[in-house]
């Protein structure tokens, strides 16, 4: 019997199965909170920059609803995982090829890239403060945190997103936590049980 703890499976991104596929099929479409937060409504499908691409799930969902999505990821390892996942989804063909055809992946720091992109809508989902009961945090998110760190520049990123967006910036954050000090007050919020979207309007759409 080995004295070593079991190895955690390597981080893997897959847009064609599991939770991502379930959310695409049964998540509620444009009625769900994320879609409403970015401004989707009948006849309106904004172009979106996901400034913190991470595992790409929000980007994939938004693209599945018809949006053109530009993902920005600065971490080398996560960027490589995303590129691989996009390629595999494209190779899967059918609806997956159509969806990832609306997704573009950029490698770089969103704070510097956002002013060059002139985005209508910017989505920001920075690494959140660790929860008090860390054992309850999904192993996958612990892996992501171990790779990307804590996003110590999150206030600068949110500020840059608000400044760059021509219509709205959206910050995804735990429902019961206040935004970091230094972030302005949102125009409005869309809150669920565990997640809140703080919306900063730049232009009434």
Region roles according to the model:
Residues 154-201:
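Conserved Class I SAM-dependent methyltransferase catalytic core
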Residues 47, 68, 102, 167-168:
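Residues at the starts of beta-strands that form the adenosine-phosphate
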């Amino acid at each position: 019997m080995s004295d070593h703890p079991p190895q955690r499976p390597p981080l893997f991104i897959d847009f064609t199965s599991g939770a991502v596929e379930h959310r695409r099929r049964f998540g509620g479409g444009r009625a769900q909170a994320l879609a409403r937060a970015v401004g989707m409504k009948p006849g309106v499908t904004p172009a979106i920059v996901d400034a913190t691409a991470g595992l790409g799930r929000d980007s994939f969902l938004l693209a599945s609803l018809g949006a053109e999505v530009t993902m920005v990821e600065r971490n080398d390892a996560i960027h490589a995982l995303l590129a691989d996942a996009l390629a595999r989804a494209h190779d899967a063909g059918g609806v997956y090829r159509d969806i990832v055809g609306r997704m573009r992946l950029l490698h770089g720091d969103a704070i510097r890239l956002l002013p060059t992109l002139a985005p209508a809508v910017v989505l920001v989902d920075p690494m959140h403060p660790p929860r008090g009961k860390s054992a309850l945090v999904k192993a996958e998110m612990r892996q992501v945190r171990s790779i990307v760190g804590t996003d110590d520049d999150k206030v600068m990123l949110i500020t840059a997103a608000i400044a760059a967006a021509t219509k709205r910036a959206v910050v995804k954050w735990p429902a019961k936590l206040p935004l970091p000090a230094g972030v302005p007050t949102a125009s409005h919020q869309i809150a669920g049980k565990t997640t809140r979207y703080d919306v900063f309007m730049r232009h009434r759409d």
